[in-house]
Amino acid sequence: MSAAVAITAADPIGDLLSRGTWKALLEHHAHVGGQHMRELFAADPERGTRFALEAAGLYLDYSKNRINAETLRLLVALALDCGLPERTAAMFRGDLINRSEQRAALHTALRAPASERIILDGVNIITQVHAALDRMAELAEKVRGGQWLGHTGKRIRNVVNIGIGGSDLGPVMAYEALRHYSAANLTLSFVSNVDGTDLIEATRDLEPEETLFIVCSKSFATLETLTNAHAARAWSLRKFGDERSVARHFVAVSTNADAVAKFGIAPSNVFPMWDWVGGRYSMDSAIGLSTMIAIGDAHFRELLRGMRTMDEHFRSAPLARNMPTLLGLLSVWNNNFLGATTLAVLPYCLLYTSRCV
């Protein structure tokens, strides 16, 4: 599902309000905006099939949106008028489409095959991505196989991910949705709330000797994350009484090597983040280390291949049969023309009813 998209004249693309394609949609809305869903199905009994699409293993039925064939045609015309295909190509190329921060938005590179080349600032970032994946896999398989030993020589049985926002929500969602694939001899917990109760509850039944913490913070200065990380460190040290134990029970995902080293985490246990990955799109980067530990390297890479399949669909499918594009265009129609400003996401599958939905 796509979030609601409100467009105003103050936005950088607000000039589209004066475009002929936008005005055509306004005129179209004046004729069809009051139609009831019953009327739409009565006029086109086959709309349940006509307004449906399958791609990358997903089936989208958008027939219950208040649209007809002309609505769809006009929305696609609007997308073309705005240069969506060109903007899509720019994103995949690594152009600086994140205009507020003057950065690329290359989360798609995180699931690109090793054979691909994407050059950013003179560097093939795909090489960096796969080097990080291989390091993640090495750690994950050691933990899963009992080769990663804690300070006292015991194997790790508990993994606690400490993060907030995109460093928490994606991993939580992925773990809960895929928990049937997770290792039976490991427990996964997630701590994001600065309220100390969150960490207390997560560690209540855990043994420090068997617990590994993953601290996810690009700057290693995020208040909530570092508050919880230091509390976890203190919890661990109460058992060991030895600062050297931190190196066996904490790993980090960060770009701040100095702060991580000061915390006591070994440089070899620090995984990279990149400015060209937004937090909300980071679950397939090292932020997903907890997911990889839970489900294993093979399943994690299968997850990446699934994402890649949808990337390729988005990149190449005609706009009228392009699932992400259609969801975005329907959001524009529902919000800006029908006045539907709230989007409900109602998963029927219990595994998808995470706190992040």
PLM regions and their residue ranges:
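Extended, charge-enriched "interface" segments that sit outside catalytic cores
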Residues: I13-T21, H28-H29, G33-F41, P45-T152
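Conserved beta-strand elements of the Class I
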Residues: N158-V160, L212, A344
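A glycine- and small-aliphatic-rich helix-loop capping segment at beta-alpha/alpha-beta transitions
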Residues: L169-A184, D205-E207, A229-L237, G264-V270
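Active-site phosphate/pyrophosphate-binding segments
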Residues: N228, W235-R355
